[in-house]
Structure formats: structure tokens, C-alpha cells
């Protein structure tokens, strides 16, 4: 079974929009890839059904149409190859193919952590185009991402319309589509798991939450922007100290297949330290962080240290604030605190990349659905992130990145004010 779709996207000047950092080629999806895509779409619909959101045939028809459209849009971009795919991901899969598949886990392959490499090793056994399989993995977690955002928002509203809105908003959110279907990146994996971790942590299932957080961290180091929320949950007595033992246990369990394949234990568990050493020396990599304002910095090493110190200061200040007001902590306060940390930590850190605000994009969207008066927050986050995506994919700036940084600074201020209102209530406003 083969269905060919030739993709050409043009801008108003007549040139190819994505001509710089990736090439769109003919999409020739074989039977396996097509079936997997259909299964993912079916899963997206089933999750809504089992969550009790499809009560009438009309609901099923409308949601089925939206799911079909979401996956059709993704399929159109499956033929796009970025330099990340050409120079790294495709070569890693080929390495597994040429060195015994899972047996090649015994050595060092790429700089992603091993849980993601398990999937690449699996793909080396299949006859389907590696590009499609990599993107299908990411789009599978797009579904889990939408589900996690919906569940998190569901702690604050029971409105079926609003829950369906956040579900489909995530599936159609520009950075979500670009990240998985165009770029072939895996940010949806760690963020979907992190959102579920927050949901379980805030809804009385701390063990599940900690396990999900460990899985998130096992896939991507950037989960550290979200992990501090569990300290807030500890302060709020939603988790206990012993629950933190689940984190290393689950993490080591995920490392075990690679270790059993012969990969050295120390190399396996310290991979992230190697990643931090290779992050690069530039203060900013197309990120809407505070360093987007930096111009002609004379001592970049000092600036990097100051940024790191500022990020840690913010984090510990939030911890102290919540400890001081621990008797006033509600789910609303935790949601505000989570947004402060997820936006503020990467905003202040040096060496941030274009995709590092992906979690902020989605958490702010769930926040806005929970509290519709703050509808502008995800729009500002998305604006900031898209500037970075455009800079990478087009190799030129649509606007200078400091405009995105200004947008995120405003989001951070609003999150601080919102959280202050929750922790120091005169009369708590009802947002839902």
C-alpha cells in the first residue's frame, strides 16, 4: 500500500518556506507506517471515549473529524528532513542496523539517553522508512501530551467543552506539530510524562507521579525544569520523602536493558553529565531567554555564572515562599508555582536552545483552560517559542529573539502575581 503526497509550501515571495534547514520530499508512506498512523489516531479518539467526553454520536463525529485532521496535517510533513535527522537520528538508526540492533546498545550511540535509543534500536529491525518511524513515535506522544494537558486542566474544571478544547488545542498547537511532524524531535515524550506526573502528584497519586517524573527525566534532561515542582508537592504534603526513592529506582530500571546489553554502568547513569559538558559556550542558542537581551557581553563566563545563580535563586525563593505559606497551598497555588518554575528556570539559565520552552508552551495552555482570564499566557509563550523555531528552520530571524524574551518576562510576572494571590488570599477568586 503506497500513498504519495508531494509537499511544497510556499511563502508570499515565491520561495520555499522551509528551504533553509530542512528539505520536504515526497511522502511515500508504506502499509506499516500508514497502519501505525491510523492506530495513533484511533488511540486519540479512544482516550476521549474512555474519559467520558464522547456522550453523543455527534460528539464522536466532530472529534473524529478533528483527530483525522490533526493526523492528516502531521502526515503531510512526514517527508521533511531536518539536518538534525540527516546528521544524527538517521545515522544512529543506521548504526543500530549495522551493529546487531539491540546488541549495539552495549556501546555509546549518539548523545540521547538510552530509553529513546531503545526505540531507535527497534526501528532498525523494521523495513519502514526511519524518518516516518521517528516521527510516528513523536506523534504518538503528541496524543499522550494532549491527554496529560486535559487531565491536568480537569483538576480545575469539569467543563466538557473546555477539556475537549485543551485536548485539540494541544494537537493543533504550532510548536507541537512542528516539533514532532516537521523536526522529528522527541520533546512531546518528556513533557507528556511530566504533565501526567504533575496530574498524579496533585490528585493524590504521588507514587505514580514520581514514577512518571523519573520516566520524563530518563528521556530528556530538560525535565529538570519541571522536577522542582515535586518539592512544592512535598511542602504541600502531597508527596512524602519516601516517594522520592521511587525516582532513582524507576530511572535505574529504565537503564537496565542497556546495562544488560553490555553498556558500562557508570557511562549509562552519567550520560547527562557528558551532555552538560557539550552544551556549548554561547549564552543563547535561538532561545527567548533573558540572554536574548545580551549584546556584546565582555565576560560571557561570568554572565553564564550569574544566570545560573539567578535560576537557582528563583527556584529556592519559590521553595521558601511555599514553605512560609504552606498552610495556604492549594492546587491553584501549585499550578501557579509550576508555571513560575517551568518558565523562570530556563528563562534565567545560560546556553538555552530554541526548544527548551516546550513545557512552558503546554503548561501555560492547560493553565489558560483552567483559568480562561489568562488566555493570553499560552499565546505569549507560543509567540516566544515560534521565534526560536523560525530562526532554526529558516536560518534567519522573523523578529529578534529579545521580543520573545520580553513576552516570557511578562508571563513570568503574571505567574508570580497569580501565585501571590493564591498564597496570600484576601478572598480567593474562583477561576473555573
Model-derived regions, located:
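Extracytoplasmic catalytic/substrate-binding loops of multi-pass membrane glycan-assembly enzymes
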Residues: 78-92, 107-119, 279-290
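Transmembrane helical bundles and short interhelical boundary loops of multi-pass, membrane-embedded
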Residues: 29-39, 48-49, 77, 269-286, ...
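Aromatic/glycine/proline-enriched transmembrane-helix motif characteristic
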Residues: 47-53, 59, 155, 275-348
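Transmembrane signal-anchor helices characteristic of membrane glycosylation enzymes that use polyprenol
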Residues: 31-87, 172-174, 248-263, 343
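Specific aromatic-rich, kink-prone transmembrane helix
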Residues: 147-151, 189-206, 363-364
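Perimembrane helix-loop-helix junctions
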Residues: 225-249
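Membrane-embedded helix bundles of polyisoprenyl
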Residues: 162-199, 210-222, 247, 339, ...
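Loop-to-helix entry region of an early transmembrane alpha helix in multi-pass inner-membrane enzymes
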Residues: 32-33, 114, 128-147, 300-312
Amino acid at each position: 500500500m503506497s500513498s504519495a503526497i508531494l509537499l511544497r509550501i510556499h511563502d508570499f515571495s515565491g520561495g520555499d518556506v522551509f528551504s533553509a534547514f530542512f528539505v520536504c520530499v515526497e511522502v511515500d508512506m508504506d502499509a506499516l507506517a500508514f497502519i501505525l498512523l491510523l492506530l495513533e489516531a484511533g488511540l486519540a479518539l479512544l482516550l476521549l471515549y474512555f474519559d467520558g467526553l464522547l456522550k453523543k454520536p455527534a460528539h464522536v463525529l466532530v472529534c473524529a473529524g478533528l483527530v483525522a485532521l490533526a493526523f492528516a496535517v502531521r502526515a503531510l510533513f512526514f517527508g521533511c528532513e531536518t539536518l538534525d535527522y540527516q546528521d544524527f537520528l538517521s545515522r544512529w538508526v543506521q548504526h543500530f542496523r549495522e551493529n546487531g540492533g539491540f546488541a549495539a546498545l552495549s556501546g555509546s550511540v549518539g548523545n540521547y539517553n538510552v530509553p529513546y535509543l531503545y526505540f531507535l534500536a527497534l526501528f532498525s529491525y523494521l523495513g519502514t522508512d526511519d524518518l516516518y518511524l521517528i516521527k510516528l513515535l513523536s506523534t504518538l506522544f503528541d496524543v499522550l501530551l494532549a491527554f496529560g494537558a486535559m487531565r491536568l486542566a480537569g483538576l480545575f474544571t469539569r467543563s466538557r467543552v473546555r477539556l475537549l478544547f485543551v485536548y485539540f488545542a494541544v494537537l493543533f498547537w504550532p510548536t507541537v506539530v512542528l516539533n514532532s511532524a516537521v523536526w522529528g524531535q522527541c520533546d512531546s515524550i518528556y513533557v507528556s510524562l511530566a504533565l501526567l506526573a504533575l496530574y498524579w502528584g496533585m490528585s493524590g497519586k504521588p507514587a505514580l507521579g514520581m514514577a512518571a517524573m523519573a520516566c520524563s527525566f530518563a528521556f530528556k534532561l530538560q525535565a529538570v525544569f519541571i522536577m522542582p515542582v515535586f518539592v512544592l508537592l512535598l511542602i504541600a504534603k502531597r508527596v512524602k520523602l519516601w516517594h522520592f526513592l521511587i525516582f532513582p529506582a524507576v530511572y535505574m530500571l529504565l537503564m537496565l536493558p542497556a546495562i544488560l546489553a553490555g553498556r558500562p554502568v557508570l557511562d549509562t547513569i552519567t550520560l547527562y553529565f557528558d551532555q552538560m559538558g557539550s552544551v556549548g559556550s554561547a549564552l543563547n542558542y535561538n532561545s527567548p531567554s533573558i540572554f536574548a537581551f545580551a549584546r556584546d557581553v565582555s565576560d560571557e563566563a561570568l554572565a553564564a555564572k550569574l544566570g545560573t545563580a539567578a535560576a537557582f535563586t528563583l527556584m529556592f525563593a519559590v521553595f521558601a515562599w511555599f514553605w512560609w505559606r504552606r498552610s495556604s497551598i492549594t492546587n491553584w497555588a501549585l499550578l501557579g508555582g509550576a508555571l513560575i518554575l517551568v518558565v523562570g528556570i530556563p528563562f534565567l539559565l545560560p546556553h538555552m536552545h530554541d526548544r527548551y520552552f516546550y513545557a512552558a508552551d503546554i503548561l501555560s495552555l492547560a493553565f489558560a483552560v483552567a483559568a480562561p482570564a489568562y488566555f493570553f499566557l499560552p499565546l505569549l509563550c507560543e509567540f516566544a517559542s515560534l521565534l526560536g523555531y523560525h530562526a532554526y528552520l529558516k536560518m534567519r530571524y522573523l523578529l529578534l529573539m529579545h521580543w520573545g524574551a520580553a513576552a516570557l518576562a511578562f508571563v513570568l510576572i503574571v505567574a508570580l502575581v497569580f501565585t501571590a494571590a493564591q498564597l496570600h488570599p484576601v478572598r480567593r477568586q474562583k477561576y473555573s
